[in-house]
Structure formats: C-alpha cells, structure tokens
C-alpha cells in the first residue's frame, strides 16, 4: 500500500478499510492477472453496492517471485509457498514471510544450489464503470540461499536485482521504488488512470 501511495502521488489512494468493512476475497485464479482482476472486480462490485462506483475506481495488485531452478515456483503461490505440499497443493493456512523464505532456502539447498535466476512479477489491475484493465511489471535477478538484509518483506532478503550486488533487503526504499516490478506495473497503469480522469472529474 505504501509503495502504491508513494508512486501514485497525484491521486487520492484509499485502503479498502477506509471505505467499507474489509471482506474476504478468494483468489483462485491461475495467473497473476486473474488474481489481480478478481480482487479489483470484487472491490468495484462492493463500491457499486455502496453507490460509490461513480466516485472511485478499484485498484489491486498480485505479485510473486518465480525461481528458475524450482520450475517457476512459487509464482502465484508466493504468499502461501510454505503451505504447499510436494504435489503442489496448498494444504494449510499458516504461511508467513519467514516460513516462505525458509522453504525457498531449503529447496535451493536440496538442489545443491547457492543461487538461481529468478524474477518478480506484479500485475496491477483496475476495475471501473468503464471496464477492467491490467498492466504487468517485472524485475529480473537472482534468488540466493541465505538471507541478507532486513529492509523489506516477503522474499526481499533472498533476491538480488540484476545489476546490483545487494539484496532488496539491503537496498534503501528509494532505490527499490525505482526498480521494483510493482513500480514498473504502476508506471504503465498510470496511462489507464489518466484516460479515466475525465470520467471522475479530474
């Protein structure tokens, strides 16, 4: 949320809890785009129920890391990786950032690897009365089998962006904002927001 607000400073950004009571959204899509759209459409539908669909648009994102040595996993299951069994099924609801990182480290070590090419994907979705839109951003680099740095969340301490020697967990926020997959997706979605400005009286 902070990254979105920092990047879209020309817009008034509200968290869902500032508009209405948060509600559960089941993310059962097979791609980042599908899950991002599921969330944006669900929020837009709620805005319609509250007669706010002409005042707001819904923006959501779905993101994750794909590691080459793991066949692209965890991918869309990045937030639930440690709940995934050997058959690729999600069997629990106890995953944390720490447990997900531990699983990634363990799987790389099981392959006798200290690192692997990897990339982050972020899909930004917008849902409005004028339609639904998506934009993707990517950040390529290397996943490593030891944690370095504590500035961040998720897999930040295990990922070295291309062109850097430090992990995301070791980089400052300003640098990460410039290079992140989410920022790249948000840069593209700005074109969508700009095209919607007249509709919302900007």
PLM-predicted stretches and their roles:
Residues 1-202:
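Anionic-ligand binding patches
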């Amino acid at each position: 949320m902070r990254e979105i607000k920092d990047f879209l400073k020309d817009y008034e950004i509200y968290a869902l809890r500032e508009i209405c009571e948060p509600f559960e959204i089941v993310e059962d899509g097979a791609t980042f785009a599908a899950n991002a759209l599921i969330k944006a459409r669900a929020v837009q539908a709620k805005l319609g129920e509250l007669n706010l669909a002409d005042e707001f648009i819904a923006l959501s994102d779905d993101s994750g890391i794909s590691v080459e040595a793991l066949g692209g996993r965890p991918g869309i299951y990045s937030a639930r990786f440690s709940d995934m069994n050997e058959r690729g099924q999600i069997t629990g609801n106890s995953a944390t950032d720490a447990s997900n990182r531990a699983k990634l480290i363990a799987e790389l070590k099981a392959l006798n690897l200290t690192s692997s090419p990897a990339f982050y994907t972020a899909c930004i979705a917008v849902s409005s009365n004028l339609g639904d839109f998506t934009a993707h951003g990517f950040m390529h680099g290397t996943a490593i089998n030891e944690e370095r740095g504590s500035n961040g969340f998720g897999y930040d301490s295990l990922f070295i962006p291309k062109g850097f020697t430090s992990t995301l967990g070791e980089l400052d926020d300003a640098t990460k904002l410039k290079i992140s997959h989410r920022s790249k997706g948000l840069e593209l979605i700005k074109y969508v927001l700009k095209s919607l400005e007249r509709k919302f009286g900007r």
